Amino acid sequence: MTRLLRALGLALATVMAGPALHSAAAKTLVFCSQGSPETLSPDAAVSSLAMDAVRPVFDTLVTFAPGTTDVVPSLATGWTISPDGLDYTFTLREDVAFQTSAIFAPTRSMNAEDVVFSFERQLPGPGAAKTLGGVYAQFRGPRLASLVESVTKLDERSVRFRLKRPAARFLADLAMPVNAIQSLEYGYRMQQQGTPERFDTQPIGTGPFRLVDDRRDVAIRYQAFEDHWRGRPKLDTLVYSITPTASARLHKLKSGECHVAAAVDPADAAAIATDPQLRLRAIPGLTLGYLAINTRRKPFDDVRVRRAINMAIDRETIVSAIYPGAGSLVETPLPLASWASDDQARAYPYDAKEARRLLLQAGVTAGLKADLWFPPDSRSYNPDAKRMARMIASDLEPLGIKLELKSAPWESYWSQLMKGDSTLALAGWIGDNGDPDEFMETLLSCAAAKDGGTNIARWCDARYDALVGEASRITERETRADLYARAQALFHEAAPWVPMASARLLDGARANVENFVMSPLGSHDFSAVDLGD
């Protein structure tokens, strides 16, 4: 088997036309990921695919301790917070090297100027660095753009963030890959050469691996960064083999074509767990699958129609079929694993008769047509979106609602939804930082309902925003939970979604994979992973 896996690594290297492995004994780990990321630029990343793809290349000021959502130092060795909660001052690690590539060789180590650059280029307003970027959906939605007032260099090793208001989630936000620290020198070099797009397509970071090659829909190849500040990774080469279907990922895992397979189909969990060559990795996840209803499109701008859609869908049957033994119904816009999920809340019950009555009351007669978008491949929050879409269409058809099922390659799927171009859409979210605000504000706030935002239902309620906004500014958990419960009640009243399921995260691994720790956030970190015999 060892010979087979080494041969695979060499074969992939040949296919991708990258540099040859430096020895026959080089350690190559192949990760069967779920699809091609929409970008390799951290600040443009929206999906978990993109965040996983940029994670090997970049570091953040702070990070999450393995297997948890606890914030620990990374590029920053420490920080202080002012008594009013508005000023965060970070002390930066010394002698952190940036990677080199065929088009760039850094002349200095990371310093405060790089931190300021990494955030200022995303803030609203003029500035030379703005030409290097595009749409920063994560930053410019309800996240940091509305929170950060300024980022200031105090000296080479100190940076101060000044916030417009206190924010309980600020440190956790900084741990997300979208807030990675990038090279000012590299950005300006590409700008001067007239190739600013390379800053995004050929990324340079301080992370444990450097990008070697990206073949869309085939594979992404990384090589160990010898000068990483934590020390050289144990792996020589890391390959993301793009494998959209769960069945194909399982086949590759069993045959030894990959060492780790993402998002195992729940139906295959038992087979993996009983195979002596494999290991099933499972963890409760901060995951949420839902059906978003575009509240700006007629007749779905009528709350009675949205409630009817909720009541016409047999959620229990669908979730049992799609997540056998690995998913549970959710009643709110929060995963079950979230401490702020209101355990007293209940979603609309399945009641086709009442759904029909509501539609008639709203003046909707038979013959209503609408589009239903679904992701092109499996996700941990929805293992079989196409099947779910068909089951939803089957539930709505007796009410005279005819759905046209649509999909798109993953790199354009989310951008399509964020444009507001869908009527109904199956979507999902994996928590990026463990804070309830990650779901309640990111997916449902008025700020995120703007064009290009992550509130694809385009629902906006000032009362909801006020509750969630207040909860985001305080740190006392009991008070926050009460505010979030009241916001969840408003969500239920307006019915902009059909909440579907919260899933356990399931990955498969070869038995010789060492030090691989799953995250409740669904991310994959190979910086400490090794391969045994």
Question: What feature does the model see in each segment?
Answer:
Residues T91, D114, L123-G187:
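Surface-exposed binding/hinge segments that line
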Residues Q223-E226, G285-A308, A312, A503:
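A bilobed periplasmic-binding-protein/Venus flytrap-type ligand-binding module shared by bacterial periplasmic
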Residues N294, S328-A362, R379-R387:
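Structural transition elements
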Residues G194-D200, F225-A271, A389, K402:
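Ligand-site clamp/hinge motif
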Residues G78-A128, R160, K252, P299-D301:
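Aromatic- and charge-enriched surface segment that lines or borders ligand/interaction sites
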Residues C32-D84, E120, G127, Q202-P208:
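N-terminal lobe/hinge region of extracytoplasmic solute-binding protein
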Residues T28-S33, R215-V218, A224, A312-S341, ...:
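Detector for C-terminal structural segments
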Residues G35-D52, L75, A102-P106, A168-A180, ...:
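A structural "hinge/loop" feature
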